[in-house]
Amino acid sequence: MNTLRCLTQALSKSGREAPKLYQKVIFPGLFREGIPIANVKKVDEKIIDSPTSTSVNGEAKKIVRHGVKYEREQVKEYLSSLPTLTLSRKQIRDDYDEERAKRMYMFSKQTNSSNKFQKLLTAKSQEFTRELLTLLIDCTSNEKNSGPERFTRKFLKFSNDEIPPLPDFSKNPQLFENYIGILSHTKFNFRSSSKLNGIVRKMLRHLLHPTNKTTLPLRSAQVYNDSIYFFSEHFDFASCREIFAQMKAEGTKPNTITFNLLLRNVVKNSHIRKTKHPDDEVLFYLRSMRNHGVFADVITWTTCYNFLRDEVSRQLYIVQMGEHLGNFNVNFVYTVLRNGDYRAEDCLKVLAANSLPISRKTFYLCIERLLNEEQLETASKLLDYGFQHLKSNFKLDSEAMNHFMRVFANKGRSDLAFLCYNTCRKIYKIKPDSQTFEMLFKALVRNGNTKNFGAVLQYIKDLKVSEGFGLRTSYWRTKADSIFKFGSPNTLSEKSIEKARKLLGNLIASEGEFSWKIWKESDSSQKKILRFLGCIPTTLRCTNTAQDHQKPTNLPSNISQKKREYRNRVKAIATKAALEKRMAYIKDNDVAFKKELVKRRIVGEV
């Protein structure tokens, strides 16, 4: 709480950044009509035909066993075009000492519980804070800008359509930056294009390849920054560092956004369990920032706050930030609140006491904290308040819905999951994402095998398709399929599916409030829907209903075995398909890449 008081005092003395925002909207549709697309020469089909069936043996078995060997070769080929740079992944060795790692982990676990070690850690933390502040102050401009201007770009969060065609950049060089931006910021669900092994990653590697003479003069700092952002979102931090090195080698000066992204990578990487603190890496980037003459902004200061590990350091940091930067923004306040163990009530009090607008991130943080505190009713009231009164601040998106859906899915509450989905979709006009439907499948599975399990499962599938999402295989959907296939004695009829359509879409919170005691507070029409879902309190279930409402763990062992075998078969089919696709790339990467681009009409063929 001392940190919050320090923050309140700093806010009262210093200004608050209110930048003038200039926004440019960049959607995939900009590249679909009237723009000449790139062409590739026709390739020999015989060279790139992959085998019709691939057994997991021989060369394929080696690929499966080693996993990353192909990726390593691709990385080495890419980096070999940068001979002047010393990069560790040019020569990757299999020298990981597992026994040493175990010893270091046990040693770290023992020393962390030592009081002497904790004192040493605190002293080291405060020494790091002093050095961190020295570098940040050196990088901060002395000129105070009361009304900074900030240019932002707006991209679609996700798209279920194909990637826009690749423009011919020799004829339209001005499109290069925006095209890289779309590939990096919009998640293309079609054919898993934006996954780490998808086509987007291959396209970025191709467009930024050191030997690509067409795009070399078009690569600005923004292009490199967008690429760093893409690999950061996939936790490929090594590629981020390599792009940063390539950027400097090709003569492009990094800017403030570049270093902010690299520091953000360190924050994300620090959440992964390891024995070494990220202090040296943070200081390296700040020294590099100073050497390049790049100024730190409020985002740099906000990002670096995440590396502080004790209350004294945090309070000192806030005071120094107020003195040298001169202003704060709502994102910094959010970072302070997120890094502390504060209740939702404390977070809202800080905003009210300082007359700060509530941002989207802070709003979602409060909902998350309320749900962790088991205050479901209060969290749902806050969600309704956000829809009614905070429209000028931000628009609710799928993340707001998914905070609730994750809680309901973990508890197996299909009733509350459908109540939340319908309320958010129909009342709050929130568009779901793929994670939303995965939580519906999960809630259904954890609710157990009920009489109408198959009808509800089919309803979720139809609902997902109607929202523009294909029926992609996922963990909880496959698990639900296996339960219905082997654990349900009832056959799926059109009548039961039609009944599900009529009932389930009408389960809506009357006053925008969710409650764990939904059965007790429901009227007769809602109870009819809850009965259909099999969500009846245990004490009110009759014998037959209780027998129908079986959890998967209570099924006979032979049925459980059949379900496991079914899921393993689905997994094996997916693995085999992915392997066959990979085999074409292993045989000839360039030819297979061109073939896929042509087949998907991302490029033309001459």
Curated annotation (Swiss-Prot):
Function, as annotated: Required for respiration. Stabilizes the mitochondrial bicistronic mRNA encoding ATP6 and ATP8, 2 subunits of the proton-translocating ATP synthase.
Primary location class: mitochondrion
Protein name: ATPase expression protein 3
PPR repeat boundaries on the chain: 220-254, 397-432, 433-467
GO molecular function terms listed in the Swiss-Prot or TrEMBL record: mRNA binding
Organism: Saccharomyces cerevisiae (strain ATCC 204508 / S288c)
Keyword field: Membrane, Mitochondrion, Mitochondrion inner membrane, Repeat
Membrane topology according to the record: Peripheral membrane protein
Top-level division of the source organism's lineage: Eukaryota
Disulfide pairings: none
InterPro entries in alphabetical order: Pentatricopeptide_rpt, PPR-containing_protein, TPR-like_helical_dom_sf
Subcellular location field: Mitochondrion inner membrane
Keyword match Cell wall biogenesis/degradation: no
Pfam families: PPR_3
Additional detail: Present with 1760 molecules/cell in log phase SD medium.
GO cellular component: cytoplasm; mitochondrial inner membrane; mitochondrion
Keyword DNA damage: no
GO biological process: mitochondrial translational initiation; mRNA metabolic process; mRNA processing
